Amino acid sequence: MKDLFGKLRAVFWVLLLGVMVTPPAAYAYEADGPRFGFNTQAYSRADVDNGGSYSRTDMNFRAGYKWLTIAYTRSDYDWNNAGDARISRGHNPWDTLHKFSVDAAFDGYLSESVDWFAGMTLISGFESQIWDSFSLSPRAGLSFRATPDLKFHLGALGLVAPAHSMLLPLVGFEWRDSRDMGLSAKLGFPATQIQYRFNDMIATRLAARWTRDLYRLSNDSAVSRKGYVEEESVVSGAYIDFTPFDSLKLTVGGELMAWHSLRVYDKHGDKKSKTDMDPSVGAVFRASYSF
């Protein structure tokens, strides 16, 4: 089963190598005024390949104004049979992980058919100590409008982090606007979706996304003292979006975390181990409001 999901992950990378300029959990039509959002999601218990299991609950709060967005995410873990978990030598690996982010996003046009986009995200992921937890993620690229309904994106995304820095190409396309009736699509990396809008208020979506988060572990962590854990996953889901008016958007859905791994690094950023988890299912609720 692990080999199967490893192959599926490789296929996912090949098919979804691209970018969505619009974030996967967008605010209600991204108004220029103040905007606020909340989402919560819970995942069922998943077995760890070297012992133990856990379930996870996430809560995210975010606020923004024009080009600036500030967000906080809290992830709570419920471990079972942690004594069998070799990742932490018989102790609970961690109970809660936190992530703060500040994002600045800009865009403009070069001509009638070419737009530009750029941005920078400052991220702090940690268990209890915020020191040595900061990462920086710049991005930039161009969007080319081939037809009124078809747009292509080309750019690059970087991640400068205490462990496992990376540079990724951004290539993707966008077909029709999500506010249009009927089918629309945004295919790319790190998220992709196909949507069908029934009317101004109701739409359904099939979506998939790749996520990667890095957390600085506590000074006395049983996993890696002053080290880091990198959590990487591929999540797919089916969602219903309800937009009673332009400034409010509500989303409910179910998700499958088909591939999920943890990589542990020491305090110098050197890799110590990798742990895979079995698939798990989850439920999602999101709400966003903009003025």
Where are the language model's segments positioned?
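Transmembrane beta-barrel strands of outer-membrane/channel proteins
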Residues: P34-S44, I70-D76, A118-S124, L154-G158, ...
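Repeated loop/turn-to-beta-strand initiation elements of outer-membrane beta-barrel proteins
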Residues: K66-Y72, E112-W116, P148-L154, D180-L183, ...
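Outer-membrane beta-barrel "beta-signal"
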Residues: L170-R176, I240-D246, D276-F291
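Sequence/structural signature of outer-membrane beta-barrel proteins
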Residues: Q41-D49, S75-R86, Y109, T121-Q129, ...
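Residue-level signature of outer-membrane beta-barrel architecture
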Residues: F61-Y65, A104-G108, F144, W175, ...
